[in-house]
């Protein structure tokens, strides 16, 4: 629909929009910000792929699935919040090499091959669940792309023992 349009710098989708087509905003090189409404529940294949300037993505609804290569080579993307996600498909964030941190909900069940391939700067994964949930996720999925990232587990209160835990401070993830 809008692929290759370099005049788009920001997209704010109203709640009445319930779906996006594959490749809808593919190669929109000047796009820096996307905000989805509550009507969007999944993102299709290559929907924002190769949007080289995309820095800020806000999901106001419950995004359950991110499709194949949805954010492929979005090289300016640095942080991401996926609190309600259940499926991240093949190569969804491959080549997002400026991605530094993500917040992932404990609803995550499936991470397919190369979901975070070539995200070499991904330092921190802030997981909203506990260690046992993460290890189960790890056993059932290929999370090798996250091998060099520190995984933090959510704890509202400061733990009395060591480990990688985090909490929200002023709306942002903060390690304990």
What do these predicted regions represent?
Residues 137-138, 163-167:
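Short conserved micro-motifs at the rims of enzyme active sites and ligand-binding pockets
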Residues 5-19, 29-42, 52-65, 75-87, ...:
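Structural signature of tandem-repeat unit edges
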Residues 142-143, 171:
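Noncatalytic linker/hinge segments flanking ATPase motor cores
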Residues 167, 173-175:
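Short linear proline/tyrosine/threonine-rich motifs used for host-factor recruitment
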Residues 72, 94, 116-117, 137-142:
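A structural signal for leucine-rich repeat
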Residues 1-3, 21-26, 44-47, 67-70, ...:
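Consensus positions within tandem repeat domains that build extended binding/scaffold surfaces
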Residues 155, 168-169:
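Acidic surface patches and DE-rich sequence motifs
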């Amino acid at each position: 629909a809008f692929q290759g349009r370099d005049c788009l710098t920001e997209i704010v989708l109203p709640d009445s929009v319930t779906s996006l087509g594959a490749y809808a905003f593919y190669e929109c090189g000047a796009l820096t910000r996307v905000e989805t409404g509550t009507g969007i529940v999944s993102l299709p294949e290559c929907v924002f792929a190769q949007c080289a300037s995309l820095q800020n993505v806000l999901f106001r609804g419950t995004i359950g699935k991110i499709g194949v290569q949805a954010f492929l080579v979005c090289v300016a993307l640095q942080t991401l919040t996926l609190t309600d996600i259940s499926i991240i498909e093949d190569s969804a964030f491959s080549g997002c090499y400026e991605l530094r941190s993500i917040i992932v909900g404990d609803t995550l069940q499936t991470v397919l091959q190369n979901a975070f391939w070539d995200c070499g700067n991904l330092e921190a994964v802030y997981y909203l669940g506990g260690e046992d949930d993460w290890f189960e996720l790890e056993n059932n999925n290929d999370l090798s792309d996250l091998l060099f990232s520190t995984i933090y587990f959510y704890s509202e209160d400061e733990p009395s023992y060591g480990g990688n835990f985090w909490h929200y401070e002023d709306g942002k993830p903060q390690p304990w």
